[in-house]
């Protein structure tokens, strides 16, 4: 009981901190029907600055880090992104009212990373004085791209297999899988895979993050990082949390249009995925000395669902998927649940490792 009590105390204490308070405040304003709005250009500007800040910090740390220290977490991030999509997509598709394509699109967003959630978790750890590897931000694109590409490829394969089954059953023709030049499996060829990778890398979130990482690695941006980005970080994050809270409440209405499976998945997936990330992070801690703060951030990245790079990527690559399903589940439920679960993963890391 003492273990459970310590976890509960940590969680309650974190809910009193500004990061989570602004998120809850935004949800309360939206629930009360407030007309408060933050212009879309302001939101995009805030996200851009936060991503550049995360990227610059990660790039500076990558420049100074041992490659071996980065390799393990990077591989773990890729594996987590792929595993979350495979498990989540096929689990969702088994539930009534959920198509294979919609399930994969939803799992793809949940396997990808939320910039706002990652920024919030960093702010919480910084506020508590908990150390973590500076290159953590560089893991974002590894997990994000792996999840989105896996989801799109599996969804395309599923669509092609369904068409083949229908055509074969009608007796009109029999299509064969493979055999084309450069073709990997049904409905997936190298050109398509290359296109998915390029589109994902060109998305606003990944582009800004990669730019920050590259500048951090090859330039000397410490002066502007410390004088401009670092001081603005917490203030901008508080506004972003307010926006995310209002957006989450507004998106909940979209879930009324789709199967109840998305509601259950949106509530449970962040916790389950975060526990998967915690398990992988704990293994890295014992094998490579990965820090307790790093374990928390890896858990939060696994728990988060993409709210910036993912939705437009899915809209473009899977136009047949239902946006009300995958955006409603991820932004309406997944993002707030992941942010509110930050204290849980902190408490677990403190109990198993010590922060």
Where are these regions (language model features)?
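Alpha-helical transmembrane segments of multi-pass small-molecule/ion transporters
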Residues: 2-27, 67-74, 78-232, 236, ...
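Helix-loop-helix hairpins and the membrane-proximal interhelical loops
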Residues: 52, 56-82, 253-264, 282
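Helical transmembrane-bundle signal
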Residues: 50, 54-57, 116, 240, ...
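Membrane-helix interface "capping/anchor" motifs
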Residues: 34-42, 93-102, 257
């Amino acid at each position: 009981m003492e273990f459970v009590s310590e976890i509960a105390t940590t969680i309650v204490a974190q809910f009193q901190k500004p990061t989570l308070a602004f998120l809850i405040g935004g949800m309360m304003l939206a629930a009360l029907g407030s007309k408060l709005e933050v212009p879309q250009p302001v939101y995009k500007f805030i996200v851009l600055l936060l991503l550049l800040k995360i990227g610059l910090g990660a790039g500076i740390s990558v420049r100074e880090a041992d490659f071996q220290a980065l390799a393990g977490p990077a591989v773990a991030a890729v594996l987590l992104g792929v595993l979350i999509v495979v498990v989540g997509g096929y689990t969702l598709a088994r539930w009534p009212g959920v198509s294979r394509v919609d399930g994969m699109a939803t799992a793809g967003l949940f396997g990808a990373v939320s910039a706002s959630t990652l920024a919030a978790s960093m702010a919480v750890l910084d506020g508590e004085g908990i150390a973590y590897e500076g290159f953590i931000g560089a893991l974002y694109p590894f997990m994000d791209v792996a999840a989105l590409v896996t989801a799109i490829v599996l969804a395309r394969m599923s669509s092609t297999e369904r068409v083949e089954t229908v055509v074969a059953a009608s007796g009109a023709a029999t299509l064969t899988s493979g055999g084309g030049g450069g073709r990997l499996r049904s409905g997936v060829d190298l050109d398509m895979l290359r296109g998915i990778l390029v589109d994902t890398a060109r998305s606003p979130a990944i582009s800004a993050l990669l730019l920050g990482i590259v500048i951090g690695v090859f330039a000397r941006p410490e002066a502007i990082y410390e004088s401009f980005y670092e001081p603005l970080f917490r203030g901008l994050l508080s506004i972003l949390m307010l926006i995310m809270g209002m957006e989450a409440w507004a998106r909940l209405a979209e879930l009324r249009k789709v199967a109840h499976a998305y509601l259950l998945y949106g509530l449970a997936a962040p916790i389950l995925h975060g526990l998967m990330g915690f398990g992988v992070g704990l293994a890295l801690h014992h094998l490579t000395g990965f820090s307790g703060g790093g374990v928390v951030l890896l858990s939060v990245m696994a728990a988060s669902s993409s709210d910036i790079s993912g939705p437009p990527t899915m809209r473009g690559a899977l136009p047949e998927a239902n946006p009300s399903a995958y955006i409603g589940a991820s932004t309406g439920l997944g993002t707030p649940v992941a942010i509110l679960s930050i204290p849980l993963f902190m408490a677990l890391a403190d109990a198993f490792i010590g922060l």
